[in-house]
From Swiss-Prot:
Encoding gene (name): fda
Enzyme's top EC category: lyase
InterPro entries in the cross-refs: Aldolase_TIM, FBA_I, FBA_I_Gram+-type
Reactions it catalyzes: beta-D-fructose 1,6-bisphosphate = D-glyceraldehyde 3-phosphate + dihydroxyacetone phosphate
GO MF assignments: fructose-bisphosphate aldolase activity
Family: Belongs to the class I fructose-bisphosphate aldolase family.
Keyword entries, A-Z: Glycolysis, Lyase, Schiff base
Gene Ontology annotations of biological process type: glycolytic process
Protein name, UniProt field: Fructose-bisphosphate aldolase class 1
Top-level taxon of origin: Bacteria
EC number assigned by the record: 4.1.2.13
Active-site residues (renumbered): E176, K213
Length: 294
C-alpha cells in the first residue's frame, strides 16, 4: 500500500470524484452529457464515448488535487489509457489524485427491504489487476430501504466479509451501504446501520483499515463516531439523488463528512460545450462540492 496516498486520504482537504458509472448506468450518464442512445451502435462505441467524457473531465485543469483527493473508476476505465498512461497512473502521477476501483457487479433483487450485492466473480483476479494498475482502493455498493435489523446486518456482514479480502490484497475498501433517501424509515435505518458498522469496525485488527461511503444522515453528525474511529481512513457521503445544492447544504451540516458525488459533479457538463465553457462548468461544480466538504 502507498503510505503517501494513505496519508493523503486521511488528512487532505477536498472530496472524492465518483466516475464509476458502469455498463448499466452509462447510457444515462451519456444522455445527461448530451449524447443520446442513438449516437452509438453497440457497447464498444458506448464505452469509447464514455471514456472520452471521463478523459475530458480528468484532463481538465479544474480537476486537480487542490480540491479532489481521490477518484473512483469503473473497471473498463482502469484498463484504458489517458495520454498514453493507464488511467490510475495518470491520476496519481499527473494529477496527484488517489485512484479507486468499483469492484461490485451490481445489486441483487430486493429482499427484506435491502439489496445485497450480486456475487463478485473473479474478485481475486480483479484485485491482482488493480494492484498492477497502481489502484489504491476499491468501492462496492449495497442499498437499504427498510429498517429491518436482520437484513441490515446481512448487508454490513457482506460488505465487511468482502472488504477483508480486499484488505488482504493490500487495498483499502470503500464500504458503501447506501440508505435510500426516499425510505420512510431513513432515520431508523441509519441508526441500525451505524450500530452494525461500529460492531464490525471494533472487530478489525490494527492493520485492517476501511473507508465508508454513506448517505448523508437525517440526524446531523450521526456518523461522528464512525469518522473518529481508529479503523476508518475517511467517511465520504454519496449524493443519493439529491440535487447538488441540496446535497451540499446537507453535507455542510455534518462535520468531517466529505463528498463523493458523481451526478453532482457532471450535471452541468455537455459534449457540445467549448473547452472553455466545459472547464468553467466543471470548475464551478468542483468548487461547490469542495466548499461543502471542508
Amino acid at each position: 500500500m502507498n503510505q503517501k496516498q494513505l496519508e493523503q486520504m486521511k488528512t487532505s482537504k477536498g472530496f472524492i470524484a465518483a466516475l464509476d458509472q458502469s455498463g448499466g448506468s452509462t447510457p444515462k450518464a451519456l444522455a445527461a452529457y448530451g449524447i443520446p442512445e442513438d449516437s452509438y451502435n453497440n457497447e464498444d462505441e458506448m464505452f469509447d464515448l464514455v471514456h472520452e467524457m471521463r478523459t475530458r473531465i480528468i484532463t481538465s485543469k479544474a480537476f486537480d488535487s487542490d480540491s479532489i483527493i481521490g477518484a473512483i473508476l469503473f473497471e473498463q476505465t482502469m484498463d484504458r489509457e489517458i495520454e498514453g498512461m493507464y488511467t490510475g497512473d495518470y491520476l496519481a502521477e499527473k494529477k496527484g489524485i488517489v485512484p479507486f476501483l468499483k469492484v461490485d457487479k451490481g445489486l441483487a433483487e430486493e429482499t427484506n427491504g435491502v439489496q445485497l450485492m450480486k456475487p463478485i466473480d473473479n474478485l481475486d483476479e480483479t484485485l491482482r489487476r488493480a494492484n498492477e494498475r497502481n489502484i489504491f482502493g476499491t468501492k462496492m455498493r449495497s442499498v437499504i430501504k427498510q429498517a429491518n435489523p436482520k437484513a441490515i446486518k446481512e448487508v454490513v456482514d457482506q460488505q465487511f466479509d468482502i472488504g477483508k479480502k480486499i484488505i488482504a490484497a493490500g487495498l483499502v475498501p470503500i464500504i458503501e451501504p447506501e440508505v435510500d433517501i426516499h425510505s420512510p424509515e431513513k432515520e431508523k435505518c441509519e441508526d441500525l446501520l451505524k450500530a452494525e458498522i461500529i460492531n464490525h469496525l471494533n472487530q478489525l485488527s490494527e492493520d485492517e483499515n476501511v473507508m465508508l461511503k454513506l448517505t448523508i444522515p437525517t440526524k446531523k453528525n450521526l456518523y461522528k463516531e464512525l469518522i473518529d474511529h481508529p479503523r476508518v481512513v475517511r467517511v465520504v457521503a454519496l449524493s443519493g439523488g439529491y440535487s447538488t445544492d441540496v446535497a451540499n447544504e446537507k453535507l455542510k451540516e455534518n462535520n468531517g463528512l466529505i463528498a463523493s458525488f458523481s451526478r453532482a459533479l457532471s450535471q452541468d457538463l455537455n459534449a457540445d460545450q467549448s473547452d472553455e465553457d466545459f472547464n468553467l462548468a466543471l470548475e464551478k461544480a468542483v468548487k461547490s462540492i469542495y466548499d461543502a466538504s471542508v
